[in-house]
């Protein structure tokens, strides 16, 4: 875990991409048949690998994805920001952390390239990753990506960070 946090966070992304490339190289599959899936901080991973190696995946499913990490971690008034500095670093006090996070934060790094198909799932009542993060990420992908990319956003209207709770069930 320590080799993939703070100023080593990019190891998480390169390791994930290397695993997908290994499956292809050894003949187990083809890139267009690989669908990557992750939620919350794993959703950040999904956004980062979509930016870094879009041709390595046929699709990406990002559930309650932490894709606007830099903006969120810069706001100490949010419930989890200060305790998350142990994982990500504190970009308010360390310019190197700020620049490092900016270099991988999915929202900041959307570019004019072809992306795999992307499904982002957010929850209206999520108090950890506010629904606006994936919504603005999807909007930026749609506005910026080149080619004919499918980027979908599903908003769970009665769910939180961990999905639907008992009080919302039918």
Predicted regions and their residues:
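Active-site-proximal cap/loop segments of hydrolase catalytic domains
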Residues: 1-170
